[in-house]
């Protein structure tokens, strides 16, 4: 079994993978495959290069990870979400040995940690430039390759694995920082007979999305059956300006008989496109 994740070694994605292998039905003998970008991870599942993969989908501060969402919506029609795992995040400021805090001229990291630590960076490093990297571990590699006084935002594990130094611990602006990761596969996990407990992720888009009340009509299919929505957001449909695809998470599995499945059938009557991204136990 080949399992993809956002690499290189030392990323929060690798930490989430290691902590949740058993939840995905995988053993310690799984072959883990680090990939350069989150889009690459999703594409590797779509193209059959890996059997399963884990990617970040949502953060408690910055919200949805658009790179992953767009990859699922537009570039991975055969990929399904089969599970999720929530990881507490503790980004640290990491440097080469001998670099002082006041010397730091540039901070590298994935865009999410840069945003999650924005207040700290403005306060402690107001003159430092912020440079996005493909991943937190890649940011540490950039620090070690530089002869300038630069830093990275990454996990303590990334510092330890690469021989770097943590100069400031837990620098996120919010104490309860967490990221929700999703497990992906080309083979959806079937619900047990009559099993309704769990979660489903659904995307949908118009026919009547330009009409007043259309979105209300769509969501009423769930409210009228007492199906709880836990998340909703929209992404551009990549057609005309102002056209969107909506994504929702709901409590309940739509691949087993019950209110969630009935609501999905009702939703289809209002839409041109409805796709179940995943229906899985939690």
Regions found by a protein language model. Name each.
Residues 1-282:
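Domain-level signature for soluble enzymes in the chorismate/prephenate branch of the shikimate pathway
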């Amino acid at each position: 079994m080949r399992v993809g994740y956002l690499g290189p070694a030392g990323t929060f994605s690798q930490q989430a993978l290691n902590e949740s292998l058993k939840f995905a039905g995988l053993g310690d003998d799984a072959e883990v495959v680090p990939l350069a970008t989150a889009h690459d991870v999703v594409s590797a599942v779509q193209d059959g290069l890996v059997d399963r993969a884990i990617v970040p989908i949502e953060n408690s501060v910055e919200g949805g990870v658009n790179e992953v969402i767009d990859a699922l919506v537009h570039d991975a029609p055969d990929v399904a979400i089969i599970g999720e795992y929530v990881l507490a995040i503790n980004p640290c400021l990491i440097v080469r040995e001998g670099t002082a805090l006041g010397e730091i001229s540039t901070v590298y990291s994935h865009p999410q940690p840069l945003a999650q630590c924005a207040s700290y960076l403005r306060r402690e490093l107001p003159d430092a430039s912020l440079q996005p990297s493909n991943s937190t571990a890649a940011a540490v590699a950039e620090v070690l390759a530089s002869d300038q006084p630069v830093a990275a935002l990454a996990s303590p594990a990334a510092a330890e694995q690469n021989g770097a130094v943590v100069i400031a611990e837990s620098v996120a602006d919010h104490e309860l920082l967490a990221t929700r990761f999703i497990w992906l596969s080309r083979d959806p996990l079937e619900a047990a007979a009559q099993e309704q407990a769990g979660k489903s992720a659904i995307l949908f888009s118009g026919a009547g999305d330009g009409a007043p009340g259309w979105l209300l009509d769509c969501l009423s299919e769930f409210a009228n059956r007492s199906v709880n929505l836990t998340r909703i957001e929209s992404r551009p449909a990549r057609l005309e300006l102002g056209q969107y695809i909506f994504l929702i998470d709901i409590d309940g599995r739509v691949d087993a008989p019950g209110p969630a499945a009935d609501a999905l059938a009702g939703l289809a009557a209002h839409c041109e496109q409805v796709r179940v991204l995943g229906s899985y136990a939690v």
